[in-house]
Protein backbone atom coordinates (compact mmCIF):
# COMPACT_ATOMS: atom_id res chain seq x y z
CA UNK A 1 0.00 0.00 0.00
CA UNK A 2 1.37 3.37 -1.00
CA UNK A 3 1.51 6.34 1.32
CA UNK A 4 -1.00 8.12 -0.94
CA UNK A 5 -3.45 5.25 -0.56
CA UNK A 6 -3.03 5.27 3.23
CA UNK A 7 -3.69 9.02 3.28
CA UNK A 8 -6.91 8.57 1.30
CA UNK A 9 -8.06 5.73 3.55
CA UNK A 10 -7.46 7.93 6.60
CA UNK A 11 -9.88 10.53 5.22
CA UNK A 12 -12.82 8.11 5.32
CA UNK A 13 -15.19 9.03 8.16
CA UNK A 14 -16.16 6.75 11.03
CA UNK A 15 -19.71 5.41 11.00
CA UNK A 16 -20.38 6.70 14.52
CA UNK A 17 -19.46 10.26 13.50
CA UNK A 18 -21.72 10.11 10.44
CA UNK A 19 -24.66 8.80 12.48
CA UNK A 20 -24.58 11.90 14.70
CA UNK A 21 -24.87 14.22 11.72
CA UNK A 22 -28.33 15.86 11.59
CA UNK A 23 -28.93 14.63 8.04
CA UNK A 24 -28.32 11.03 9.10
CA UNK A 25 -30.55 11.44 12.13
CA UNK A 26 -33.36 12.21 9.69
CA UNK A 27 -32.54 9.14 7.60
CA UNK A 28 -32.50 6.97 10.74
CA UNK A 29 -35.96 8.21 11.69
CA UNK A 30 -37.29 7.36 8.24
CA UNK A 31 -35.52 4.08 7.43
CA UNK A 32 -34.41 2.76 10.82
CA UNK A 33 -31.03 2.51 12.52
CA UNK A 34 -30.15 -0.95 11.17
CA UNK A 35 -30.73 -0.09 7.51
CA UNK A 36 -28.70 3.11 7.73
CA UNK A 37 -25.77 1.43 9.50
CA UNK A 38 -25.74 -1.45 7.01
CA UNK A 39 -25.75 1.03 4.14
CA UNK A 40 -22.88 3.07 5.61
CA UNK A 41 -20.78 -0.08 5.92
CA UNK A 42 -21.41 -0.84 2.24
CA UNK A 43 -20.60 2.75 1.28
CA UNK A 44 -17.30 2.55 3.15
CA UNK A 45 -16.50 -0.70 1.34
CA UNK A 46 -17.35 1.00 -1.97
CA UNK A 47 -15.14 3.97 -1.08
CA UNK A 48 -12.21 1.68 -0.26
CA UNK A 49 -12.67 -0.09 -3.61
CA UNK A 50 -12.58 3.25 -5.44
CA UNK A 51 -9.43 4.31 -3.60
CA UNK A 52 -7.73 0.98 -4.24
CA UNK A 53 -8.58 0.98 -7.96
CA UNK A 54 -8.26 4.68 -8.86
CA UNK A 55 -6.15 6.28 -6.10
CA UNK A 56 -8.93 8.87 -5.68
CA UNK A 57 -11.88 9.46 -3.39
CA UNK A 58 -15.37 8.60 -4.74
CA UNK A 59 -17.38 11.32 -6.48
CA UNK A 60 -19.92 11.42 -3.66
CA UNK A 61 -17.30 11.76 -0.88
CA UNK A 62 -18.21 15.41 -0.23
CA UNK A 63 -21.85 14.58 0.63
CA UNK A 64 -22.28 11.20 2.28
CA UNK A 65 -25.79 12.05 3.45
CA UNK A 66 -27.05 12.84 -0.05
CA UNK A 67 -25.55 9.64 -1.46
CA UNK A 68 -27.05 7.63 1.38
CA UNK A 69 -30.44 9.25 0.82
CA UNK A 70 -30.39 8.37 -2.89
CA UNK A 71 -29.39 4.78 -2.21
CA UNK A 72 -32.01 4.32 0.49
CA UNK A 73 -34.75 5.79 -1.69
CA UNK A 74 -33.76 3.51 -4.56
CA UNK A 75 -33.72 0.44 -2.30
CA UNK A 76 -37.14 1.36 -0.90
CA UNK A 77 -38.81 1.39 -4.31
CA UNK A 78 -41.22 -1.47 -4.92
CA UNK A 79 -40.06 -4.20 -7.28
CA UNK A 80 -43.45 -3.82 -8.97
CA UNK A 81 -43.13 -0.25 -10.19
CA UNK A 82 -45.84 1.48 -12.22
CA UNK A 83 -44.75 2.17 -15.80
CA UNK A 84 -46.26 3.88 -18.83
CA UNK A 85 -46.74 1.17 -21.45
CA UNK A 86 -46.19 2.63 -24.92
CA UNK A 87 -44.81 -0.56 -26.45
CA UNK A 88 -47.83 -1.12 -28.67
CA UNK A 89 -48.69 -4.37 -26.86
CA UNK A 90 -51.90 -3.93 -24.88
CA UNK A 91 -51.80 -7.14 -22.82
CA UNK A 92 -48.06 -7.10 -22.21
CA UNK A 93 -47.09 -10.20 -20.19
CA UNK A 94 -43.92 -8.59 -18.82
CA UNK A 95 -45.86 -5.50 -17.75
CA UNK A 96 -48.64 -7.35 -15.93
CA UNK A 97 -51.22 -7.95 -18.67
CA UNK A 98 -54.74 -6.59 -18.06
CA UNK A 99 -55.32 -3.35 -16.18
CA UNK A 100 -58.10 -3.78 -13.65
CA UNK A 101 -61.43 -2.00 -13.74
CA UNK A 102 -62.12 0.51 -10.97
CA UNK A 103 -64.79 -1.83 -9.62
CA UNK A 104 -62.21 -4.62 -9.31
CA UNK A 105 -59.72 -2.33 -7.57
CA UNK A 106 -62.34 -1.30 -5.02
CA UNK A 107 -63.36 -4.91 -4.44
CA UNK A 108 -59.76 -5.97 -3.79
CA UNK A 109 -59.22 -3.03 -1.42
CA UNK A 110 -62.29 -4.04 0.57
CA UNK A 111 -61.17 -7.68 0.69
CA UNK A 112 -57.77 -6.64 2.06
CA UNK A 113 -59.09 -4.25 4.69
CA UNK A 114 -61.68 -6.43 6.42
CA UNK A 115 -62.65 -10.03 7.05
CA UNK A 116 -64.80 -11.31 4.18
CA UNK A 117 -67.12 -14.25 3.56
CA UNK A 118 -64.48 -16.17 1.60
CA UNK A 119 -65.61 -19.59 2.84
CA UNK A 120 -68.43 -18.62 5.18
CA UNK A 121 -72.13 -19.17 4.54
CA UNK A 122 -74.10 -16.32 6.10
CA UNK A 123 -77.42 -18.15 5.69
CA UNK A 124 -76.35 -21.38 7.36
CA UNK A 125 -73.68 -19.88 9.66
CA UNK A 126 -71.28 -22.57 8.54
CA UNK A 127 -68.52 -23.25 6.10
CA UNK A 128 -69.11 -22.22 2.51
CA UNK A 129 -67.14 -22.72 -0.70
CA UNK A 130 -64.80 -20.03 -2.03
CA UNK A 131 -65.78 -20.62 -5.68
CA UNK A 132 -69.54 -20.47 -5.12
CA UNK A 133 -70.26 -16.80 -5.91
CA UNK A 134 -68.09 -16.82 -9.02
CA UNK A 135 -69.52 -20.12 -10.19
CA UNK A 136 -73.01 -18.62 -10.08
CA UNK A 137 -71.87 -15.64 -12.16
CA UNK A 138 -69.94 -17.77 -14.65
CA UNK A 139 -72.88 -20.12 -15.12
CA UNK A 140 -75.14 -17.15 -15.79
CA UNK A 141 -72.72 -15.73 -18.38
CA UNK A 142 -71.62 -18.95 -20.10
CA UNK A 143 -74.59 -21.27 -19.68
CA UNK A 144 -72.41 -23.87 -17.94
CA UNK A 145 -73.67 -26.10 -15.12
CA UNK A 146 -70.82 -25.25 -12.73
CA UNK A 147 -67.41 -23.59 -12.54
CA UNK A 148 -64.04 -23.85 -10.81
CA UNK A 149 -61.39 -21.16 -10.20
CA UNK A 150 -57.63 -21.67 -9.86
CA UNK A 151 -54.64 -19.33 -9.99
CA UNK A 152 -53.94 -19.34 -13.76
CA UNK A 153 -54.92 -21.14 -16.94
CA UNK A 154 -51.86 -23.39 -16.89
CA UNK A 155 -53.06 -24.61 -13.50
CA UNK A 156 -56.56 -25.02 -14.93
CA UNK A 157 -55.30 -27.31 -17.70
CA UNK A 158 -53.19 -29.32 -15.25
CA UNK A 159 -56.12 -29.78 -12.85
CA UNK A 160 -58.55 -30.60 -15.66
CA UNK A 161 -56.29 -33.39 -16.95
CA UNK A 162 -55.16 -34.75 -13.57
CA UNK A 163 -58.67 -34.94 -12.12
CA UNK A 164 -60.42 -36.51 -15.11
CA UNK A 165 -57.85 -38.51 -17.10
CA UNK A 166 -54.90 -39.53 -14.93
CA UNK A 167 -53.64 -42.94 -16.04
CA UNK A 168 -55.51 -42.67 -19.33
CA UNK A 169 -54.89 -41.45 -22.87
CA UNK A 170 -55.83 -37.95 -23.99
CA UNK A 171 -56.37 -37.54 -27.73
CA UNK A 172 -55.13 -34.23 -29.20
CA UNK A 173 -54.42 -33.02 -32.73
CA UNK A 174 -50.72 -32.71 -33.52
CA UNK A 175 -51.36 -29.16 -34.75
CA UNK A 176 -52.59 -28.15 -31.27
CA UNK A 177 -49.62 -29.24 -29.15
CA UNK A 178 -48.88 -25.67 -28.18
CA UNK A 179 -46.06 -24.13 -26.20
CA UNK A 180 -46.64 -20.85 -24.39
CA UNK A 181 -44.20 -18.59 -22.58
CA UNK A 182 -41.81 -20.17 -20.13
CA UNK A 183 -41.64 -23.45 -22.10
CA UNK A 184 -45.11 -24.52 -20.88
CA UNK A 185 -45.97 -27.33 -23.31
CA UNK A 186 -49.17 -29.36 -23.52
CA UNK A 187 -47.26 -32.70 -23.72
CA UNK A 188 -45.29 -31.82 -20.57
CA UNK A 189 -48.46 -30.88 -18.70
CA UNK A 190 -50.04 -34.19 -19.68
CA UNK A 191 -47.09 -36.12 -18.29
CA UNK A 192 -47.25 -34.12 -15.06
CA UNK A 193 -50.97 -34.88 -14.83
CA UNK A 194 -50.33 -38.61 -15.26
CA UNK A 195 -51.91 -38.76 -18.72
CA UNK A 196 -50.62 -40.36 -21.91
CA UNK A 197 -50.62 -38.14 -24.98
CA UNK A 198 -52.19 -39.69 -28.09
CA UNK A 199 -51.43 -37.47 -31.08
CA UNK A 200 -53.68 -37.60 -34.12
CA UNK A 201 -53.57 -36.00 -37.55
CA UNK A 202 -50.72 -33.92 -38.88
CA UNK A 203 -49.45 -30.44 -38.14
CA UNK A 204 -51.74 -28.81 -40.71
CA UNK A 205 -54.62 -31.27 -41.19
CA UNK A 206 -56.66 -33.30 -38.73
CA UNK A 207 -59.95 -35.03 -39.60
CA UNK A 208 -62.85 -36.39 -37.56
CA UNK A 209 -61.86 -39.94 -38.52
CA UNK A 210 -58.47 -39.38 -36.83
CA UNK A 211 -60.17 -38.92 -33.48
CA UNK A 212 -62.53 -41.86 -34.00
CA UNK A 213 -59.69 -44.20 -34.93
CA UNK A 214 -57.63 -43.13 -31.91
CA UNK A 215 -60.25 -44.05 -29.31
CA UNK A 216 -59.62 -47.26 -27.40
CA UNK A 217 -60.47 -48.83 -24.04
CA UNK A 218 -57.92 -46.57 -22.29
CA UNK A 219 -59.07 -43.25 -23.78
CA UNK A 220 -59.95 -40.76 -21.06
CA UNK A 221 -60.55 -37.51 -22.96
CA UNK A 222 -60.75 -35.92 -26.37
CA UNK A 223 -59.09 -32.51 -26.14
CA UNK A 224 -59.14 -29.31 -28.19
CA UNK A 225 -56.46 -26.67 -27.63
CA UNK A 226 -57.08 -23.25 -29.12
CA UNK A 227 -53.89 -22.10 -30.85
CA UNK A 228 -54.21 -18.57 -29.52
CA UNK A 229 -50.52 -17.67 -29.84
CA UNK A 230 -49.87 -18.87 -33.40
CA UNK A 231 -51.74 -19.57 -36.63
CA UNK A 232 -51.42 -22.27 -39.28
CA UNK A 233 -52.65 -21.07 -42.66
CA UNK A 234 -52.93 -22.50 -46.16
CA UNK A 235 -53.78 -26.17 -46.75
CA UNK A 236 -55.38 -26.84 -43.36
CA UNK A 237 -58.21 -28.82 -41.79
CA UNK A 238 -59.37 -28.90 -38.20
CA UNK A 239 -62.26 -30.52 -36.38
CA UNK A 240 -64.44 -27.87 -34.76
CA UNK A 241 -65.46 -28.20 -31.13
CA UNK A 242 -69.11 -28.94 -31.96
CA UNK A 243 -68.15 -31.83 -34.24
CA UNK A 244 -65.68 -33.20 -31.69
CA UNK A 245 -68.34 -32.95 -28.97
CA UNK A 246 -70.67 -35.01 -31.15
CA UNK A 247 -67.96 -37.65 -31.59
CA UNK A 248 -67.47 -37.65 -27.83
CA UNK A 249 -71.19 -38.22 -27.24
CA UNK A 250 -71.26 -41.08 -29.73
CA UNK A 251 -68.28 -42.80 -28.14
CA UNK A 252 -69.11 -41.80 -24.54
CA UNK A 253 -65.80 -39.93 -24.14
CA UNK A 254 -65.74 -36.47 -22.48
CA UNK A 255 -64.45 -33.58 -24.59
CA UNK A 256 -62.46 -30.78 -22.95
CA UNK A 257 -61.09 -27.57 -24.44
CA UNK A 258 -58.38 -25.11 -23.49
CA UNK A 259 -59.24 -21.71 -24.94
CA UNK A 260 -56.15 -19.96 -23.59
CA UNK A 261 -57.08 -16.28 -23.82
CA UNK A 262 -60.82 -16.69 -23.62
CA UNK A 263 -63.31 -13.89 -24.35
CA UNK A 264 -66.77 -13.65 -22.83
CA UNK A 265 -68.08 -11.28 -25.52
CA UNK A 266 -68.09 -11.36 -29.30
CA UNK A 267 -65.17 -9.05 -30.04
CA UNK A 268 -66.25 -8.58 -33.65
CA UNK A 269 -69.08 -6.28 -32.47
CA UNK A 270 -66.33 -3.83 -31.47
CA UNK A 271 -64.51 -4.12 -34.77
CA UNK A 272 -61.95 -6.54 -33.31
CA UNK A 273 -61.03 -9.99 -34.64
CA UNK A 274 -63.41 -12.76 -33.60
CA UNK A 275 -62.27 -15.14 -30.87
CA UNK A 276 -64.07 -18.33 -29.72
CA UNK A 277 -66.11 -17.87 -26.55
CA UNK A 278 -66.62 -20.36 -23.70
CA UNK A 279 -70.40 -20.10 -24.00
CA UNK A 280 -70.24 -21.26 -27.62
CA UNK A 281 -68.28 -24.36 -26.66
CA UNK A 282 -70.59 -25.11 -23.73
CA UNK A 283 -73.60 -24.83 -26.05
CA UNK A 284 -71.86 -27.17 -28.49
CA UNK A 285 -71.61 -29.85 -25.80
CA UNK A 286 -67.99 -29.57 -24.66
CA UNK A 287 -67.75 -31.01 -21.14
CA UNK A 288 -65.10 -28.66 -19.70
CA UNK A 289 -63.67 -25.38 -21.02
CA UNK A 290 -60.69 -23.56 -19.49
CA UNK A 291 -59.52 -19.99 -20.10
CA UNK A 292 -57.56 -17.12 -18.55
CA UNK A 293 -58.83 -14.31 -16.37
CA UNK A 294 -56.17 -11.71 -17.19
CA UNK A 295 -56.14 -11.71 -20.98
CA UNK A 296 -59.13 -10.85 -23.16
CA UNK A 297 -61.47 -11.19 -20.19
CA UNK A 298 -59.71 -8.18 -18.64
CA UNK A 299 -59.56 -9.34 -15.03
CA UNK A 300 -56.91 -10.63 -12.60
CA UNK A 301 -54.64 -13.59 -13.23
CA UNK A 302 -56.81 -16.66 -12.79
CA UNK A 303 -57.64 -19.95 -14.44
CA UNK A 304 -61.34 -20.49 -15.05
CA UNK A 305 -62.97 -23.83 -15.83
CA UNK A 306 -66.65 -24.05 -16.74
CA UNK A 307 -68.66 -27.11 -17.70
CA UNK A 308 -70.66 -30.08 -16.50
CA UNK A 309 -71.45 -30.27 -12.79
CA UNK A 310 -70.24 -33.86 -12.31
CA UNK A 311 -66.86 -33.15 -13.89
CA UNK A 312 -66.42 -29.87 -12.02
CA UNK A 313 -67.08 -31.85 -8.82
CA UNK A 314 -64.16 -34.12 -9.75
CA UNK A 315 -61.94 -31.05 -10.04
CA UNK A 316 -63.11 -29.55 -6.75
CA UNK A 317 -62.40 -32.77 -4.84
CA UNK A 318 -58.94 -33.37 -6.34
CA UNK A 319 -55.95 -32.68 -4.01
CA UNK A 320 -54.41 -30.35 -6.60
CA UNK A 321 -57.36 -27.97 -6.29
CA UNK A 322 -56.28 -26.81 -2.85
CA UNK A 323 -52.70 -26.29 -4.05
CA UNK A 324 -53.91 -24.28 -7.03
CA UNK A 325 -56.83 -22.38 -5.53
CA UNK A 326 -57.15 -18.62 -5.92
CA UNK A 327 -56.84 -16.23 -2.97
CA UNK A 328 -59.44 -13.75 -1.76
CA UNK A 329 -57.96 -10.78 -3.66
CA UNK A 330 -58.08 -12.66 -6.96
CA UNK A 331 -61.62 -13.83 -6.32
CA UNK A 332 -62.76 -10.33 -5.34
CA UNK A 333 -61.28 -8.77 -8.49
CA UNK A 334 -62.62 -11.53 -10.73
CA UNK A 335 -66.13 -11.30 -9.30
CA UNK A 336 -66.21 -7.53 -9.79
CA UNK A 337 -64.92 -7.92 -13.35
CA UNK A 338 -67.49 -10.60 -14.22
CA UNK A 339 -70.31 -8.41 -12.91
CA UNK A 340 -69.37 -5.83 -15.56
CA UNK A 341 -70.33 -8.39 -18.19
CA UNK A 342 -73.90 -8.33 -16.89
CA UNK A 343 -74.14 -4.77 -18.29
CA UNK A 344 -72.68 -5.24 -21.79
CA UNK A 345 -73.71 -1.77 -22.98
CA UNK A 346 -71.17 -0.18 -20.60
CA UNK A 347 -68.46 -2.83 -20.94
CA UNK A 348 -66.25 -1.00 -23.46
CA UNK A 349 -66.21 2.05 -21.20
CA UNK A 350 -65.65 0.35 -17.83
CA UNK A 351 -63.29 -2.50 -18.76
CA UNK A 352 -59.80 -1.06 -19.41
CA UNK A 353 -58.71 -3.91 -21.69
CA UNK A 354 -61.68 -3.47 -24.00
CA UNK A 355 -61.44 0.33 -23.81
CA UNK A 356 -57.80 0.26 -24.97
CA UNK A 357 -58.38 -2.34 -27.66
CA UNK A 358 -61.27 -0.39 -29.15
CA UNK A 359 -59.60 3.03 -29.34
CA UNK A 360 -59.84 4.36 -32.88
CA UNK A 361 -56.76 5.15 -34.92
CA UNK A 362 -58.07 8.69 -35.44
CA UNK A 363 -58.35 9.42 -31.71
CA UNK A 364 -54.88 8.00 -31.04
CA UNK A 365 -53.37 10.05 -33.87
CA UNK A 366 -55.08 13.22 -32.61
CA UNK A 367 -53.64 12.63 -29.14
CA UNK A 368 -50.12 12.17 -30.52
CA UNK A 369 -50.38 15.32 -32.63
CA UNK A 370 -51.63 17.30 -29.65
CA UNK A 371 -48.55 16.36 -27.60
CA UNK A 372 -46.00 16.62 -30.41
CA UNK A 373 -45.11 20.32 -30.12
CA UNK A 374 -44.34 20.21 -26.38
CA UNK A 375 -42.23 17.09 -26.78
CA UNK A 376 -40.39 18.58 -29.75
CA UNK A 377 -39.48 21.62 -27.65
CA UNK A 378 -37.84 19.26 -25.15
CA UNK A 379 -36.17 16.76 -27.48
CA UNK A 380 -35.97 18.56 -30.82
CA UNK A 381 -32.29 19.50 -30.55
CA UNK A 382 -31.24 15.85 -30.71
CA UNK A 383 -34.18 14.11 -32.37
CA UNK A 384 -36.69 14.58 -35.15
CA UNK A 385 -40.18 13.94 -33.78
CA UNK A 386 -42.89 12.64 -36.10
CA UNK A 387 -46.35 11.15 -35.67
CA UNK A 388 -46.45 7.96 -37.72
CA UNK A 389 -49.01 5.22 -38.30
CA UNK A 390 -48.21 1.90 -36.64
CA UNK A 391 -49.84 -1.39 -35.69
CA UNK A 392 -50.57 -2.36 -32.09
CA UNK A 393 -50.86 -5.97 -31.01
CA UNK A 394 -53.17 -7.47 -28.43
CA UNK A 395 -50.46 -9.49 -26.68
CA UNK A 396 -50.26 -12.37 -24.19
CA UNK A 397 -50.65 -14.87 -27.02
CA UNK A 398 -54.06 -13.49 -28.00
CA UNK A 399 -54.92 -13.22 -31.72
CA UNK A 400 -51.25 -13.43 -32.76
CA UNK A 401 -51.61 -12.50 -36.44
CA UNK A 402 -54.09 -9.66 -35.96
CA UNK A 403 -52.93 -6.07 -35.58
CA UNK A 404 -54.76 -2.89 -34.59
CA UNK A 405 -54.17 0.35 -36.55
CA UNK A 406 -52.64 2.93 -34.22
CA UNK A 407 -50.36 5.98 -34.14
CA UNK A 408 -46.96 6.54 -32.55
CA UNK A 409 -44.67 9.40 -31.65
CA UNK A 410 -41.30 8.54 -33.18
CA UNK A 411 -37.87 9.87 -32.23
CA UNK A 412 -35.13 9.77 -34.89
CA UNK A 413 -31.60 10.99 -33.96
CA UNK A 414 -30.41 13.84 -36.18
CA UNK A 415 -26.97 12.25 -36.43
CA UNK A 416 -28.39 8.80 -37.22
CA UNK A 417 -26.56 7.12 -34.34
CA UNK A 418 -28.46 4.16 -32.92
CA UNK A 419 -26.63 4.56 -29.63
CA UNK A 420 -28.60 7.77 -29.03
CA UNK A 421 -31.84 5.77 -29.21
CA UNK A 422 -30.53 3.23 -26.72
CA UNK A 423 -29.43 6.03 -24.39
CA UNK A 424 -32.81 7.78 -24.68
CA UNK A 425 -34.73 4.57 -23.99
CA UNK A 426 -32.47 3.89 -20.99
CA UNK A 427 -33.02 7.43 -19.68
CA UNK A 428 -36.79 6.98 -19.86
CA UNK A 429 -36.55 3.67 -18.01
CA UNK A 430 -34.85 5.52 -15.13
CA UNK A 431 -37.70 8.02 -14.69
CA UNK A 432 -39.75 7.93 -11.45
CA UNK A 433 -42.51 6.44 -13.60
CA UNK A 434 -40.61 4.71 -16.43
CA UNK A 435 -41.80 5.22 -20.00
CA UNK A 436 -41.43 2.04 -22.06
CA UNK A 437 -41.36 2.19 -25.85
CA UNK A 438 -39.63 0.12 -28.53
CA UNK A 439 -36.75 0.68 -30.93
CA UNK A 440 -37.40 -0.32 -34.51
CA UNK A 441 -36.23 0.73 -37.96
CA UNK A 442 -33.85 3.42 -36.69
CA UNK A 443 -36.48 5.11 -34.51
CA UNK A 444 -37.76 4.97 -30.97
CA UNK A 445 -41.53 4.41 -31.17
CA UNK A 446 -44.06 5.40 -28.52
CA UNK A 447 -47.35 3.79 -29.54
CA UNK A 448 -49.99 6.00 -27.93
CA UNK A 449 -52.80 3.41 -27.82
CA UNK A 450 -52.40 2.70 -24.10
CA UNK A 451 -51.79 6.30 -23.01
CA UNK A 452 -54.68 7.45 -20.84
CA UNK A 453 -52.94 9.57 -18.19
CA UNK A 454 -51.49 12.36 -20.35
CA UNK A 455 -50.54 14.62 -17.45
CA UNK A 456 -48.36 11.99 -15.78
CA UNK A 457 -46.78 11.09 -19.13
CA UNK A 458 -45.89 14.71 -19.91
CA UNK A 459 -44.58 15.27 -16.39
CA UNK A 460 -42.16 12.38 -16.89
CA UNK A 461 -41.17 13.25 -20.45
CA UNK A 462 -40.41 16.89 -19.68
CA UNK A 463 -38.15 16.14 -16.70
UniProtKB/Swiss-Prot annotation:
<dbReference type="GO" id="GO:0001717">
    <property type="term" value="P:conversion of seryl-tRNAsec to selenocys-tRNAsec"/>
</dbReference>
<dbReference type="GO" id="GO:0005737">
    <property type="term" value="C:cytoplasm"/>
</dbReference>
<protein>
    <recommendedName>
        <fullName>L-seryl-tRNA(Sec) selenium transferase</fullName>
        <ecNumber>2.9.1.1</ecNumber>
    </recommendedName>
</protein>
<feature type="modified residue" description="N6-(pyridoxal phosphate)lysine">
    <location>
        <position position="295"/>
    </location>
</feature>
<dbReference type="InterPro" id="IPR015424">
    <property type="entry name" value="PyrdxlP-dep_Trfase"/>
</dbReference>
<dbReference type="InterPro" id="IPR015421">
    <property type="entry name" value="PyrdxlP-dep_Trfase_major"/>
</dbReference>
<keyword id="KW-0648">Protein biosynthesis</keyword>
<dbReference type="InterPro" id="IPR025862">
    <property type="entry name" value="SelA_trans_N_dom"/>
</dbReference>
<keyword id="KW-0711">Selenium</keyword>
<comment type="pathway">
    <text>Aminoacyl-tRNA biosynthesis; selenocysteinyl-tRNA(Sec) biosynthesis; selenocysteinyl-tRNA(Sec) from L-seryl-tRNA(Sec) (bacterial route): step 1/1.</text>
</comment>
<dbReference type="Pfam" id="PF03841">
    <property type="entry name" value="SelA"/>
</dbReference>
<dbReference type="GO" id="GO:0001514">
    <property type="term" value="P:selenocysteine incorporation"/>
</dbReference>
<comment type="similarity">
    <text>Belongs to the SelA family.</text>
</comment>
<keyword id="KW-0663">Pyridoxal phosphate</keyword>
<comment type="subunit">
    <text>Homodecamer; pentamer of dimers. Binds only one seryl-tRNA(Sec) per dimer.</text>
</comment>
<dbReference type="Pfam" id="PF12390">
    <property type="entry name" value="Se-cys_synth_N"/>
</dbReference>
<dbReference type="GO" id="GO:0004125">
    <property type="term" value="F:L-seryl-tRNA(Sec) selenium transferase activity"/>
</dbReference>
<keyword id="KW-0963">Cytoplasm</keyword>
<dbReference type="InterPro" id="IPR018319">
    <property type="entry name" value="SelA-like"/>
</dbReference>
<comment type="function">
    <text>Converts seryl-tRNA(Sec) to selenocysteinyl-tRNA(Sec) required for selenoprotein biosynthesis.</text>
</comment>
<dbReference type="InterPro" id="IPR004534">
    <property type="entry name" value="SelA_trans"/>
</dbReference>
<keyword id="KW-0808">Transferase</keyword>
Amino acid sequence: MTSETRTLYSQLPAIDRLLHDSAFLSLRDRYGHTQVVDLLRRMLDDARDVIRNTQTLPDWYADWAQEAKLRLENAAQSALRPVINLTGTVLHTNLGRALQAQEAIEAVTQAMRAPVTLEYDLDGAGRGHRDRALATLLCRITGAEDACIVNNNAAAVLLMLAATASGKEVVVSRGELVEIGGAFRIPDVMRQAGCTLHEVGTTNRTHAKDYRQAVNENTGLLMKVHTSNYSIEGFTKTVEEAELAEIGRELDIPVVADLGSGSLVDLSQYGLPKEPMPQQLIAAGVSLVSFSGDKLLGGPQAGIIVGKKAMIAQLQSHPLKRALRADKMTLAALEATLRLYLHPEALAEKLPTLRLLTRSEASIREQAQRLQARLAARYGDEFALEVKPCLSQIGSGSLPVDRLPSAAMTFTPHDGRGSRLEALAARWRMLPVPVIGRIYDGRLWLDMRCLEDESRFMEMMLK
